[in-house]
A protein has these predicted regions:
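Extended, polar beta-sheet/loop recognition surfaces of beta-rich domains
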Residues: 132
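Conserved metal-binding segment of the jelly-roll/cupin
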Residues: 103-126
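Non-catalytic, conserved peripheral segments adjacent to functional cores
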Residues: 1-106, 127, 137-200
Length: 200
């Protein structure tokens, strides 16, 4: 298992080792000890989700209040998506920047998205099934969004992207910042310290 940090701090790309034979393929797509050794933090699983999307569907940009926050560990179990991680943490040195990873049922790559980061993916196959592990249960009142087509963020999405009504009505980054909706960098750092395995 190879794990590398992305351009947005506290986000990681995970490439599992696949074992193929005449029967098919076996892989470990999440392994706590390898994850903790590479990232220096724990992943306390609280919920697992699956979404199925047709080509062109965009889900995001989503994030949760910090504290409590909700980290995610995401993979495409069927089909393919382009997965985006956006830094929404006010005060972060990389605030407003983003990185992306191609997730598909060939490479079987995964992405870890730390608390306070925004998350979006676009389905690039006819159908894409995505599995998420999360560190907190879904809490509707603490879940928020930023508009996926916000030009200030500049994700390479097309204007005809298929959005939910909620995502289409989400504020821009500037509006979310002005309203105090976004996570604070210092609050996120406190949370990262709390889940750190360093020195434990």
């Amino acid at each position: 298992m190879q794990i590398r940090e992305l351009r947005v701090p506290h986000a990681y790309e995970v490439t599992p080792v696949q074992h193929a034979d005449s029967r098919g393929v076996f892989l470990e797509w999440f392994k706590a000890d390898a994850f903790e050794a590479a990232t220096g933090r724990a992943f306390d699983l609280r919920q697992s989700n699956i979404s199925v999307s047709k080509r062109g569907v965009v889900r995001g940009i989503h994030f949760a209040d910090v504290p409590l926050g909700q980290a995610k560990y995401v993979t495409a179990v069927a089909g393919s998506v382009t997965d985006y991680i956006i830094d929404l943490r006010v005060g972060s040195p990389t605030f407003g920047s983003w990185d992306s990873v191609e997730l598909d049922d060939d490479s079987r790559k995964c992405v870890f998205i730390g608390e306070g980061l925004g998350h979006l993916f676009v389905a690039t196959s006819e159908s894409a099934t995505v599995s998420y592990l999360t560190t907190d249960v879904f809490r509707p009142g603490r879940e928020h969004g930023v508009h996926p087509l916000d030009t200030d963020i500049g994700l390479p999405l097309t204007a005809d992207a298929l959005l939910s009504d909620k995502d289409a009505a989400a504020p821009t980054l500037t509006q979310a910042l002005a309203s105090g909706l976004l996570p604070q960098w210092d609050d996120c750092l406190d949370l990262y310290t709390a889940v750190s395995t360093q020195g434990a």
